[in-house]
A protein has these predicted regions:
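A generic, well-ordered mixed alpha/beta core segment in the N-terminal half of proteins
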Residues: 76-146
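Metallocofactor- and cofactor-centric catalytic cores in central/energy metabolism, strongly enriched
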Residues: 63, 69
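Conserved, mostly hydrophobic/aromatic
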Residues: 59
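N- or domain-start disorder-to-order transition segments that initiate the globular core
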Residues: 13-47
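Conserved small/polar residues in nucleotide/adenosyl-binding loops
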Residues: 150-155
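Polybasic, low-complexity association/targeting segments
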Residues: 1-13
Length: 160
């Protein structure tokens, strides 16, 4: 007799989109690639004391509303222009809530805020949001907590 003993509590499996497919679906333009690269380069120069501006990384704890995030980014862009000689403003764009043990886990994991866990949708929303923020000319910083965030552009060391 054969007994089913594996995966007894799994209701369904949903395959994650590959990084390649997400990048093909939401490609990065040369203009946005230049903004990302130059943001990373500027950050590196400030950290290496080659630029005396202060770095400000500001934004919400975790993004839950992409439209509100873009409105916030537009306001930061105005401040970035006003204080460009004194400050480098980077928008904090976190998609997960790693220290939350109960409740909503973040935009990537549950983009509809309803417990449906449409992770593929969340990945696309995240990448698209970072793209649009960079397209405004504003650098974006995120926290990499999970391999699911591998498809999102963000400022980091331009040499890597």
């Amino acid at each position: 007799m054969t007994y089913e003993t594996d995966d007894l509590r799994i209701e369904s499996l949903n395959e994650l989109s590959s990084p390649k497919s997400v990048r093909e679906e939401i490609p990065i333009s040369d203009e946005v690639a230049s903004i990302v690269y130059n943001s990373r380069l500027a950050l590196s120069k400030i950290l290496d004391f080659e630029d005396d501006r202060l770095i400000l990384i500001v934004g919400p704890c975790s993004i839950h509303d992409p439209i509100a995030a873009l409105e916030y980014a537009a306001k930061l862009k105005v401040l970035q222009e006003k204080y460009k000689n004194e400050l480098m403003i980077i928008m904090r764009v976190y998609f997960e809530k790693p220290r939350t043990t109960v409740g909503w886990k973040g935009l990537i994991n549950d983009p509809d805020l309803d417990g449906s866990f449409k992770i593929n949708k969340g990945i696309r929303i995240g990448r698209d949001l970072l793209y649009k923020i960079n397209e405004m000319g504003l650098g974006a910083g995120t926290e990499y907590l999970d391999c699911l965030l591998y498809t999102s552009p963000s400022p980091r060391d331009p040499t890597k």
